[in-house]
Amino acid sequence: MLCDAVKENDLVYIITGFVLLPHKVPEMDGTVSSMLLARALVMAFGAKPVIVCPADSVQAIEKCAAVVGLHIYEDPDIVQTLPLSMGVAAFTKNLADAPAQAAELATRKPAAVVSVEACGANALGVCHNAIGLDVTALQARSDVLWEKLRADGVPNIAIGDLGNEIGMGTIADHIKKYVPFTDRGECQCGCGGGHIKRHQD
């Protein structure tokens, strides 16, 4: 799908960053994978990847950019004018502010969006970790951006491993058979919704 959607100088959003308990720091599997994907998009297509993540992840992403051979900027206009470049954008954790930021990012008309291990809320609006605890306050609400871009018809790919990530609602019935804490009443936070990402994917 990316081969058909992405052309030279096209913007591609990569959504990542999952902040974990108890230390309240981001996990790195999604971040590292996203950096390698960003490099692949630049090398294969001449694309302009922008990592969208919680503010907690920005420093790690900026430090990793040189490791994958890319220059990194927080201004997407600069990214689109310079070679071998990528961007990073911190996305809000405040749900009330998320629609406005999502709308602003959407105006840049990305050719595609890829979510890699980014947290998504369940049907009740609660974000969970792997064992069903409420981590809503820790997470960037980039699921709002995902839903906005999907509604706009932007080609999209989601990667996750436990069901609480963006995009996993698409295969919710399958995930509920094999992954604990995902179905209604199974999470440990008391919301009763399970940790499966709501099916708006």
Task: Name each region found by the language model.
Residues 63-146:
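An acidic, phosphate/nucleotide-engaging active-site surface
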Residues 27-33, 112-113, 119-201:
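Conserved mixed alpha/beta catalytic, RNA-binding, or beta-rich assembly cores of soluble enzyme
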Residues 1-11:
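Positively charged, low-complexity intrinsically disordered leader regions
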Residues 27-46:
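Histidine-anchored nucleotide/phosphate-binding helix
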Residues 11-12, 16-33:
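Short, glycine-rich nucleotide/cofactor-binding loops
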Residues 48-56:
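Short internal beta-strands
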Residues 57-63, 166-167:
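Short, charged/polar "capping" segments at the starts of alpha-helices
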